[in-house]
Amino acid sequence: MYAVIKTGGKQYKVAVGEKLKVEQIPADIDAEITLDQVLAVGEGESIQFGTPLVSGASVKATVVSHGRHAKVTIFKMRRRKHYQKHGGHRQNYTELRIDAINA
C-alpha cells in the first residue's frame, strides 16, 4: 500500500517502513505525527484519488531526526568589473519514518 502526501509545499509518494526527508516540522525526535493531507491512496492496481484530498485518509509517521542538507553555493560575478559575490544556503529538514497508512 502506498500514499501520496503533501507536506511543506511538496508531494511525496510513501509506503509503510520508508524513511524520507521533508521540510522542517516543529516536532520532537521520536514524536508521532499525523499527516492529514493525503492526495491519493493505492494498493496494487486500485488507486483512489482525492478531490483534492482523500476524505478520512491519514498517514502516521515518527520523527527520526532533524538536520540540514548539504550547502548550495551561490556565486555571482560581473565580467571585467571586479565584482564577485559569494553566498550559500543550507535548508533544514526533518527525517520521518512512515508507520501506517489509514485509508
From Swiss-Prot:
A matching Pfam family: Ribosomal_L21p
Presence of the UniProt keyword Zinc in the record: no
UniProt keyword terms in alphabetical order: Ribonucleoprotein, Ribosomal protein, RNA-binding, rRNA-binding
Origin superkingdom: Bacteria
Intrachain S-S bonds: none
InterPro entries noted in UniProt: bL21-like, bL21-like_sf, Ribosomal_bL21, Ribosomal_bL21_CS
Any GO BP: translation
GO MF entries: rRNA binding; structural constituent of ribosome
GO cellular component: cytoplasm; ribonucleoprotein complex; ribosome
Subunit structure: Part of the 50S ribosomal subunit. Contacts protein L20.
Record family assignment: Belongs to the bacterial ribosomal protein bL21 family.
Functional note: This protein binds to 23S rRNA in the presence of protein L20.
Protein name, as recorded: Large ribosomal subunit protein bL21
Naturally occurring in which organism (per UniProt): Burkholderia mallei (strain ATCC 23344)
Organism ancestry: Bacteria, Pseudomonadati, Pseudomonadota, Betaproteobacteria, Burkholderiales
Gene responsible for this protein: rplU
